[in-house]
């Protein structure tokens, strides 16, 4: 009789282990879902709208001394339209890819790519002057999107890649 109970316990233990091995991955924490499913795609979409529909304002906010004013050169307009298209595509891809899966590996792969893009985005404003990175009292609306918001996104991505906020896998409670 004891052997039967032992085998039943062992089989039950094996069944539980099999279920745990095939369980879906832990969901992505709420903060990351809020930032990467909503906040970033909406802000990127906003950038697309301004780059396409408000080109003179976009250029003026980027660097007023070199902005051409209301008469935007055709080449500049084409480049801004292309930028708007890239922002639109990025916004839709991020929102749709991350909504399609809870697989943290997929999320992390995208976060690595976007983190590299964050560094490129920050580097792209260097011609404005090094103080653009820290002189917050001089920032305008587009600077807030280009600098502190990108800092925030990069830090949030780093936290996600480091596993901050995720439940630890394989942690077992000590039985007494």
Predicted regions and their residues:
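Transit-peptide-like, low-complexity N-terminal presequences
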Residues: 2-31, 166-176
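Membrane-targeting and insertion segments and their boundary/processing signals
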Residues: 19, 62, 66, 93, ...
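Eukaryotic polytopic
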Residues: 28-47, 80-83, 103-176
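Hydrophobic transmembrane helix segments
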Residues: 41-72
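Membrane-helix exit/interface motif
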Residues: 50, 57, 90-100, 124-131
């Amino acid at each position: 009789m004891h052997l039967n109970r032992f085998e039943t316990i062992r089989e039950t233990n094996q069944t539980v282990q099999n279920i745990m091995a095939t369980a879906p991955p832990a969901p992505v924490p709420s903060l990351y879902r809020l930032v990467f499913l909503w906040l970033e795609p909406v802000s990127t979409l906003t950038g697309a709208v301004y780059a396409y529909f408000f080109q003179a304002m976009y250029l003026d906010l980027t660097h007023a001394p070199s902005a051409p004013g209301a008469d935007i050169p055709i080449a500049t307009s084409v480049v801004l339209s292309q930028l708007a298209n890239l922002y639109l595509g990025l916004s839709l891809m991020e929102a749709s890819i991350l909504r399609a899966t809870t697989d943290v590996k997929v999320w992390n792969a995208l976060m690595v790519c976007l983190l590299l893009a964050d560094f490129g985005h920050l580097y792209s404003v260097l011609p404005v002057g090094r103080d653009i990175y820290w002189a917050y009292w001089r920032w305008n609306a587009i600077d807030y999107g280009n600098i502190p918001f990108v800092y925030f996104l990069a830090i949030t991505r780093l936290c996600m890649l480091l596993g901050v906020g995720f439940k630890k896998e394989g942690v077992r409670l000590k039985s007494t």
